[in-house]
């Protein structure tokens, strides 16, 4: 059995359902989370809709007219994770608005550099989980995985599930 102790994975849930409402996306996250934890990975789940995340493409939208923006605290969690999984439902054949907002906000920090002068997301692993009863899982996964690799995440083969 593989041991990945020391690695941290963060699941960002783009469901449109506020806690404690049951989310099918949360159910799929839990299945993936159990597999990771079985192999020693520490995991955390953040349900985006439960937070006041301002839309936009700047690291802190309170500097651009918004009264509240909880993204900077979430971004700190993103940077502490070795693995980032963006999860969300399909609505009308596309990713949910919350999932798209997560991607926008990740991109807002894409210009930051690490200590080696590389993009801050460089060398981290990305993946996605998609739920829904509509066609379009591969399309939604394609959008998310491209959005992760563009700023530096490594996307391994078959890094999506739906």
Features from the language model and the residues they span:
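N-terminal beta1-alpha1-beta2 submodule of the flavodoxin-like/Rossmannoid cofactor-binding fold
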Residues: 1-116
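Ligand-binding pocket scaffold of soluble enzyme catalytic domains
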Residues: 2-5, 9-13, 127-129, 157, ...
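Short, glycine-/small-residue-rich phosphate/pyrophosphate-handling segment
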Residues: 23, 115-161
């Amino acid at each position: 059995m593989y041991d990945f102790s020391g690695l941290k994975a963060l699941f960002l849930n783009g469901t449109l359902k506020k806690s404690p409402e049951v989310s099918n996306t949360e159910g799929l996250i839990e299945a993936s989370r159990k597999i990771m934890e079985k192999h020693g990975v520490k995991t955390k789940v953040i349900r985006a809709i439960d937070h006041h995340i301002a839309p936009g493409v700047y690291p802190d939208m309170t500097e651009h007219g918004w009264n509240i923006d909880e993204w900077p605290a979430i971004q700190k969690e993103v940077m502490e994770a070795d693995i980032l999984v963006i999860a969300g439902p399909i609505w009308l054949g596309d990713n949910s608005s919350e999932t798209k907002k997560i991607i926008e906000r990740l991109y807002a920090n894409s210009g930051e550099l690490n200590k080696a002068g590389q993009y801050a997301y460089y060398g981290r692993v990305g993946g996605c989980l998609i739920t829904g009863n509509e066609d379009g899982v591969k399309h939604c996964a394609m959008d998310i995985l491209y959005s992760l690799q563009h700023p530096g995440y490594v996307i391994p083969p078959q890094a999506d599930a739906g």
